[in-house]
Amino acid sequence: MHIGGGVVKIRILILLMLALFLLGCSSNVNTNVKLKVFHAGSLTEPMKAFKRAFEEKHPNVEVQTEAAGSAATIRKVTELGRKADVIATADYTLIQKMMYPEFANWTIMFAKNQIVLAYRNDSRYADEINSQNWYEILKRPDVRFGFSNPNDDPCGYRSLMAIQLAELYYNDPTIFDELVAKNSNLRFSEDNGSYVLRMPSSERIEINKSKIMIRSMEMELIHLVESGELDYFFIYKSVAKQHGFNFVELPVEIDLSSPDYAELYSKVKVVLANGKEVTGKPIVYGITIPKNAENRELAVEFVKLVISEEGQEILRELGQEPLVPPRADTAVPSLKAMVEVS
């Protein structure tokens, strides 16, 4: 009996050890992997939807999203040394200019947008403003408007580009001067048929705060308009729709939306404080996986979701046009079946 009891105890001990081992394995399987996605502020709502869809497919993954202006988003990796698994920006060329070749080596272009002028129902002169008189409304002394910081956010330099292009479209050389130059130290200069604005460093930007407000990211202007501190702000159409704003659709010649006007858009350039020159072009968003991504396989799956038909439908539902088919600037073996290489 004594020997038999010992055998039973040994078997029980073995079973307990096996159970603990299996429990440990199970625990490891269920431990959340954190997939870090740094993205442009204007992608905040789409990223919430991508996060939900991805986590449903990958229950052991927690997608951590973090919004900022696109240039600021990239600087988190290139200057601050932070780790991200996916980077998504509102201007695909920023990835190429700021991350190649050290931090990334490919970009997929996946979505489009356009610049609009958004406002509340009770913004000053909301009942008068339209696509032909908007700049006259903004000139009025009791009207305040805003845009994001061009050094941090593509929406900022695109807003300034749109205002400068308005001078050409409306044949009025005073529009930018009256709206921006008169109220800040931001000025375009003409150079061989092109118009160039050289940005001071962010801490040296000077503005008349009774007329203009600037924030690092376009999304930070939303509450200023909602609270009545601002009457109007330049923003992407998708963001205006997502947040229920009224908006003036600017003429296609100045809203940076159409490839048909790429040559016209290219007449305006902004040199950022870091020395990078940005040329006016149709708005196209970009996505990449940094070279030092810690969860590369999952990052590839996340990018696949964004550029898939499901991802394209998510964008459409949120008022943003996907680029169909998505285009890559170089062959990406793990994604080649889903993109065109241009």
Curated annotation (Swiss-Prot):
Q: Where is the signal peptide?
A: 1-24
**Coiled coil, from the record:** none
Q: Which key words tag this protein in UniProt? A: Cell membrane, Membrane, Metal-binding, Molybdenum, Signal, Transport
Membrane topology, from the record = Peripheral membrane protein
- Gene3D superfamilies on file: Periplasmic binding protein-like II (3.40.190.10)
Q: Where does tungstate bind?
A: G41, S42, S70, D153, P154, C155, E218, Y236
**One GO BP:** molybdate ion transport
One GO MF term: tungstate binding
Main location group = membrane
Highest taxon above the source species: Archaea
Q: Kindly indicate whether the keyword Transmembrane belongs to this entry.
A: no
Spell out the GO cellular component terms annotated for this protein, sorted alphabetically and separated by semicolons.
Answer: plasma membrane
Subcellular location(s) of the protein: Cell membrane
- Residues bound to molybdate are G41, S42, S70, D153, P154, C155, E218, Y236
The Swiss-Prot or TrEMBL record describes its family as follows: Belongs to the bacterial solute-binding protein 1 family. WtpA subfamily.
User: What is said about its interaction partners and assembly?
Assistant: The complex is composed of two ATP-binding proteins (WtpC), two transmembrane proteins (WtpB) and a solute-binding protein (WtpA).
Tell me the function of this protein: Part of the ABC transporter complex WtpABC involved in molybdate/tungstate import. Binds tungstate and molybdate.
Q: Which PANTHER family match?
A: MOLYBDATE-BINDING PERIPLASMIC PROTEIN, MOLYBDATE_TUNGSTATE-BINDING PROTEIN WTPA
* Name of the protein described by the UniProt record: Molybdate/tungstate-binding protein WtpA
